[in-house]
Amino acid sequence: MAIEVKICGLSTAETLEAALAAGADLVGFVHFPKSPRHVPLEAAPALSRAVAGRAAKVLLLVDPDDATLAAAVAAFQPDIIQLHGKESPERVAAIRARTGRPVMKALPVSGPADLAVVPAYAAVADRLLFDAKPAPDDTLPGGNGRVFDWTLLAGLDPGRPVMLSGGLDAGNVSQALSVVRLDGVDVSSGVETAPGLKSPEKILAFVRAVKAAEAASRPSRLKKVEAP
């Protein structure tokens, strides 16, 4: 199965088109005012329409209340809701039931102890996204360009599709894919020139790096040799 590529934090028509043209499988829109990648509700419909079925639309929210959730879902019309805050398993289940949308729960990781919550979230979320745990001085729950020890995920099988995030870019994504089995990779700061400013060139380079790594990892096909 092909590894899915998600470009997150898109906020302009130009960079959205760059992600779609590059072949991204999922495009992420952040609705969180504290983020430099924040997309306000009034800008959401145009971006959502521009996707036009070429990729899955992911709406990233951080600890949304019911009013924020309803307004954002109405504006973005997402295919998947990504929860990137401290939402409990019970809240994840409630959001999934309330919206009727698949939910991807982001889980922050810095050490083995952080994986103890995986079974509880795997029971209620449709997908799991493992991201680097923010440092104490980080103001955002994700998109900080931090990398964690990918080997922590080796052998992990939560019974749900798994995506990796946290400091990925075109230069290190192949290494990540060689360390742990993944269903997808998620990039934001790794395709930016500054916080919130996506680079079409970096987006293309990242997608190409994933595809190249995927192709290189496929078992070689042995040619049949006829006996003399």
UniProtKB/Swiss-Prot annotation:
KW Nucleotide-binding (keyword) present: no
GO molecular function, one term: phosphoribosylanthranilate isomerase activity
EC number: 5.3.1.24
GO biological process: L-tryptophan biosynthetic process
Keyword vocabulary terms for this entry: Amino-acid biosynthesis, Aromatic amino acid biosynthesis, Isomerase, Tryptophan biosynthesis
Family: Belongs to the TrpF family.
This protein's name: N-(5'-phosphoribosyl)anthranilate isomerase
Organism listed in the record: Azorhizobium caulinodans (strain ATCC 43989 / DSM 5975 / JCM 20966 / LMG 6465 / NBRC 14845 / NCIMB 13405 / ORS 571)
